[in-house]
């Protein structure tokens, strides 16, 4: 018998915190909880590697949690805060692109990322939604971000450590209502991949 109780690990509990914060972001209409989900998403892999608990089960759970926290939740926040037919359509497109991106990631064994990672896509969307009070602009951005996620653009998996530390601080600021720095760093990351792709690197 397949017993979840016997195979679940400490890193899986961290992943479940990602799911919980993603769900709460929807229920409470909270942008800040998306940033907290990103922190948990970063920590679960780190904990799994440090504790030697990397598993197929954990990978599947992580993928499901990402759909909730970085696909469904940002899409809901877009529509709920900018109610319009265009926001509805773009929210659906964003969520579908995120799911497709995760499905592709699950079957590829490559160094780095193909397409913008969905946590980065979620950060971009919620950051723009917080700072730009326009359903039209945010709806268009949601579609563009979705297309970036399913593109063939390559992105580095682990930027240098200094970037990671700065990004961690920026996420903490975003959680307390200052998303500007996290959005700027993520935008640089997204543009970096586009420039390298155009140059053929």
Swiss-Prot record:
Q: Which GO terms describe its biological process?
A: phospholipid biosynthetic process
Class of this enzyme? transferase
Q: Where in the cell is it found?
A: Cell membrane
Q: Which reaction does it catalyse?
A: a CDP-1,2-diacyl-sn-glycerol + L-serine = a 1,2-diacyl-sn-glycero-3-phospho-L-serine + CMP + H(+)
**Primary localisation category:** membrane
Its Gene Ontology cellular component terms are: plasma membrane
Q: Which residues cross the membrane?
A: 19-39, 57-77, 88-108, 112-132, 133-153, 162-182
Q: How does it sit in the membrane?
A: Multi-pass membrane protein
What is the E.C. number? Answer: 2.7.8.8
Q: Which Pfam families match?
A: CDP-OH_P_transf
Q: Which UniProt keywords apply?
A: Cell membrane, Lipid biosynthesis, Lipid metabolism, Membrane, Phospholipid biosynthesis, Phospholipid metabolism, Transferase, Transmembrane, Transmembrane helix
Molecular function terms, GO-annotated: CDP-diacylglycerol-serine O-phosphatidyltransferase activity
Answer whether the UniProt record assigns the keyword Transferase to this protein.
yes
**Protein family (similarity comment):** Belongs to the CDP-alcohol phosphatidyltransferase class-I family.
Indicate what this protein is called per its UniProt record: CDP-diacylglycerol--serine O-phosphatidyltransferase
């Amino acid at each position: 018998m397949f017993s979840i109780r016997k195979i679940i690990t400490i890193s899986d509990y961290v992943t479940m915190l990602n799911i919980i914060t993603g769900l709460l972001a929807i229920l409470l209409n909270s942008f800040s909880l998306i940033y907290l989900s990103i922190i948990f998403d970063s920590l679960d892999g780190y904990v799994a590697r440090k504790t030697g608990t990397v598993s197929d089960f954990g990978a599947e759970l992580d993928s499901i949690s990402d759909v909730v926290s970085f696909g469904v939740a940002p899409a809901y926040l877009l529509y709920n805060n900018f109610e319009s037919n265009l926001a509805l359509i773009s929210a659906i497109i964003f969520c579908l692109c995120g799911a497709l991106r995760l499905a592709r990631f699950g079957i590829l064994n490559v160094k780095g990322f193909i397409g913008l990672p969905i946590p980065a896509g979620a950060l971009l969307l919620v950051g723009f939604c917080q700072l730009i009070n326009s359903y039209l602009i945010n709806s268009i951005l949601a579609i563009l971000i979705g297309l970036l996620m399913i593109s063939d653009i390559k992105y580095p998996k682990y930027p240098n450590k200094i970037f990671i530390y700065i990004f961690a601080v920026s996420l903490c600021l975003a959680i307390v209502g200052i998303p500007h720095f996290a959005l700027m760093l993520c935008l640089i990351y997204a543009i970096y991949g586009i420039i390298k792709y155009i140059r053929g690197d």
